[in-house]
Swiss-Prot record:
Coiled-coil annotated residue ranges, if any: 380-412
GO cellular component: centriole; ciliary basal body
Protein name in UniProt: POC1 centriolar protein homolog A
InterPro entries xrefs: G-protein_beta_WD-40_rep, WD40/YVTN_repeat-like_dom_sf, WD40_repeat_CS, WD40_repeat_dom_sf, WD40_rpt, WDR55_POC1
Gene that this sequence comes from: poc1a
């Protein structure tokens, strides 16, 4: 019987950096991968065979983060030299310089519409920028230590930040007001990202753990202790059902969020694994670290289970910034500690705020508030249907495996 889960496979690797790689990002089309390095350079790797890579130099110190804009017309990079650069990802490598902070800039993140840029810095601040005007919109100063990472939610309504002050802060992107502060019980988080549904966040921590938080109820949903050293980065699969992590223990881990278990451990890097990223389609992912090479993997394990569900989500939702997959050895729960709550409702859409204080009506005379509510209910029903479909697939797979085991047992007894 063929399994619905196939192991991830290493497709290719790229070498060209002269020091540890700190950050990765796929272009929206999946045709390019950008990487930043301690060697102060940004490189853009073309996935087409025999295509040359672009090397961009301009930063005066280590590059800490890179990200493509949603249109792929720009590539942002941050650096320890306290600046941010916006590059045109072509052979010329032209860039615009932002003198952003008074300390090292740790991360950059484009908003879903590509109009804004979010930066986090060792100067303990988060800054929101207008990409077009190249001006600061506002500065947020609620952290009291280095801010390691700040991200926009896929739906554009929220922002999240993590700091060495051992807090995770959730912000309203429109009002720029602090909504909630999560306190980390162990070490500090060096990386944070939103679930594709914008309902949860995951943090990568210095205490070797990964935590998944529900931002609606402000509760800890899942807690994974699967690494033996600090977790440096993570990336959600676009389906929202798997989470990829990179650690200083040199391994990559793939977590099944629906079942709350470790699915694969990937070995390949020599030394610390510092960054991971799924492609927007989810069929590939990339990893990199102190061994100065970018590894590109074919996801495989997710293609049978969730490709149809992912397509359904695209048909019903506005596409959001997403990522790709991994490879390795199947893992069971034994020997690994996890604290898990079900994520079956994790894809539920966030409720939409009413746009104006006045009742609005559409062309058919139906109140806008009622239309919005009905659309939200329909969205919730779609998510429920997709979740049930996934559970049915898993149940069928389990039944098939059980049947095969019973047949093998019966055959063994017959032979003896």
């Amino acid at each position: 019987m063929s399994s619905a889960l196939d192991d991830p496979t290493l497709e290719r690797n790229f070498k060209g950096h002269r020091d540890a790689i700190t950050s990765l990002d796929f272009s929206p089309s999946g045709k390019q991968i950008a990487s930043g390095s301690v060697d102060a350079s940004v490189m853009v790797w073309n996935m087409k065979p025999q295509s040359r890579a672009y090397r961009f130099t301009g930063h005066k110190d280590a590059v800490t983060c890179v990200q493509f804009s949603p249109s792929a017309h720009l590539l942002a990079s941050s650096s320890r030299d306290k600046t941010v650069r916006l590059w045109v990802p072509s052979v010329k490598g032209e860039s615009v310089l932002f003198r952003a902070h008074t300390g090292s800039v740790r991360s950059v993140c484009f908003s879903a519409d590509g109009q804004s840029l979010l930066t986090a810095s060792d100067d303990q601040s988060i800054k929101l920028w207008s990409v077009h005007r190249q001006k600061i919109i506002c500065t947020l100063r609620e952290h009291n230590n280095w801010v390691r990472c700040a991200r926009f939610s896929p739906d554009g309504q929220l922002m999240v930040s993590v700091s060495d002050d051992r807090t995770v802060k959730l912000w309203d992107a429109s009002s720029r007001q602090l909504i909630h502060t999560f306190c980390e019980p162990g070490g500090y988080s060096s990386y944070v990202d939103f679930h594709p549904s914008s309902t949860c966040i995951a943090t990568a921590s210095s205490d070797n753990t990964v935590r998944v938080w529900d931002i609606r109820t402000h509760t800890l949903l899942q807690h994974y202790q699967v690494h033996s050293a600090a977790v440096n980065a993570l990336s959600f699969h676009p389906s929202g059902n798997h989470l990829l992590t990179a650690s200083s223990d040199s391994t990559l881990k793939i977590l099944d969020l629906l079942e709350g278990r470790l699915l694969y451990t990937l070995h390949g890097h020599q030394g610390s694994a510092s960054c991971v990223s799924f492609s927007r389609s989810g069929d590939q992912f990339a990893s990199a670290g102190s061994d100065q090479q970018v590894m590109v993997w074919r996801t495989n394990f997710d293609s049978v289970d969730y490709s149809r569900v992912l397509q359904q989500k695209r048909d019903h939702r506005t596409p959001s910034a997403q990522a790709s997959g991994a490879a390795g050895d199947p893992e069971s729960r034994s020997g690994q500690k996890t604290e898990v709550s079900p994520l079956l409702g994790v894809s539920a859409e966030r409720s939409v705020r009413e746009p104006t204080p006045q009742q609005q009506t559409d062309a058919d005379g139906v109140p806008a508030a009622l239309t919005s509510t009905l659309q939200h209910i329909i969205g919730q029903l779609d998510v429920l249907t997709q979740t049930v479909a996934i559970l049915e697939q898993r149940l069928t797979l389990t039944e098939d495996k059980l049947k095969e085991c019973l047949e093998q047992q019966h055959q063994a007894l017959t032979e003896h």
